[in-house]
């Protein structure tokens, strides 16, 4: 059931060296720097995104994710979701408007998996970067690098998947698009969506709470993905796997690392969902094919390197 949560809105990542991180996210991924704040955080967006930022970088001593935020339809929905979270037993933290530049008040909570999420209703609307709202051209001419289209999703590793599933489906209004079941029928991976997308956030069982596997950015075509692979090679960027295809979601994909060790994905294509679609199920005996559809062999680094 729709509870008013619209889409992924932003993610804040910790990076070890801001200048190297910006070279990666701006020059290689093609994000646009939009702002900086007095804490030293840098705000970035992809060119099609209409709000001011979707990625916040914070310099720190270790990499990883501070939090992921979802935008809700309006303040009334935010107040109701806040009440629902508290009624469900979640401790919520109020973050005032302006704590993130150009963003309204946020309601933060911790999922049973150990990850921090937040909800907000307002963020400065800047429109698509480099385009007018009236009679727009197809794309801006001066995009850099991969010219990432949007921040799309994040994949988390943590424990307590059933409780996390209940929170996201019963309180926040997500639905299960795809899953992986072990030989006992226990769900060990869950791909959750708010929309027709293959997923907006995903969780994989891991004994340690609160770990990040990757943040993902959308590209338009397979040719864009191959060009992204060329740019990864040209810049000697550390690559994990790809270009290849997932069995899960059927998206075409490349995984690589930012200079701090945070894993990034760029992808195109993939499945779509409507309310009458049943969840797609994979079994762990086919996990190699589910993750890497062509090779059908698990990459140990892909499964174990987390931030």
From Swiss-Prot:
Chain ranges of the VOC domain: 7-122, 150-269
Record's keyword terms, sorted: Aromatic hydrocarbons catabolism, Dioxygenase, Iron, Metal-binding, Oxidoreductase, Plasmid, Repeat
Positions with a binding annotation for Fe cation: 153, 214, 265
Top-level division of the source organism's lineage: Bacteria
InterPro entries in alphabetical order: Catechol_2-3_dOase, Fosfomycin_Res_Enzymes, Glyas_Bleomycin-R_OHBP_Dase, Glyas_Fos-R_dOase_dom, VOC, Xdiol_ring_cleave_dOase_1/2, XylE-like_N
EC number from the UniProt entry: 1.13.11.2
Catalytic activity: catechol + O2 = (2Z,4E)-2-hydroxy-6-oxohexa-2,4-dienoate + H(+)
Pfam families linked: Diox-like_N, Glyoxalase
Pathway linked to the protein: Xenobiotic degradation; toluene degradation
A Gene Ontology BP annotation from the UniProt entry: toluene catabolic process
Swiss-Prot/TrEMBL cofactor(s): Fe(2+)
Entry-linked PROSITE patterns: EXTRADIOL_DIOXYGENAS, VOC
Keyword Zinc-finger included in the entry's annotation: no
UniProt xrefs under CDD domains: 2_3_CTD_C (cd07243), 2_3_CTD_N (cd07265)
A GO molecular-function descriptor: ferrous iron binding
Subunit comment: Homotetramer.
Family the entry assigns: Belongs to the extradiol ring-cleavage dioxygenase family.
Name of the protein in question: Metapyrocatechase
């Amino acid at each position: 059931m729709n509870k008013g949560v619209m889409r992924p809105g932003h993610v804040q990542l910790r990076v070890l060296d801001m200048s190297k991180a910006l070279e990666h996210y701006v020059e290689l991924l093609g994000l646009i720097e939009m702002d900086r704040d007095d804490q030293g955080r840098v705000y970035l967006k992809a060119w099609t995104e209409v709000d001011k930022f979707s990625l916040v970088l914070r310099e720190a001593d270790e990499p990883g994710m501070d939090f992921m935020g979802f935008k809700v339809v309006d303040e009334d929905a935010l107040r109701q979701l806040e009440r629902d979270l508290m009624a469900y037993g979640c401790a919520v933290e109020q973050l005032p408007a302006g704590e993130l530049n150009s963003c309204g008040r946020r309601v933060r909570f911790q999922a049973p998996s150990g990850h921090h999420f937040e909800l907000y209703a307002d963020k400065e609307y800047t429109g698509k970067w480099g385009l007018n709202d009236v009679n727009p051209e197809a794309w801006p001419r001066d995009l850099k690098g991969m010219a990432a289209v949007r921040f799309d999703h994040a994949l988390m590793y943590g424990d307590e998947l059933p409780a996390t599933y209940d929170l996201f489906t019963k309180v926040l209004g997500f639905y299960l698009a795809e899953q992986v079941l072990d030989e006992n029928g226990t769900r060990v991976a869950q791909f959750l969506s708010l929309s027709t997308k293959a997923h907006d956030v995903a969780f994989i069982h891991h004994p340690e709470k609160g770990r990040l596997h990757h943040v993902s950015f959308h590209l338009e075509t397979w040719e864009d993905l191959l060009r992204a692979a060329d740019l990864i090679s040209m810049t000697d960027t550390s690559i994990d796997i790809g270009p290849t295809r997932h069995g899960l979601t059927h998206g075409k994909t490349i995984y690589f690392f930012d200079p701090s060790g945070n894993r990034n994905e760029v992808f195109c294509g993939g499945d779509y969902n409507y309310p009458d679609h049943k969840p797609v199920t994979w079994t762990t005996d086919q996990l190699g094919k589910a993750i890497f559809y062509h090779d059908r062999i698990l990459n140990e680094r892909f499964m174990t390197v987390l931030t």
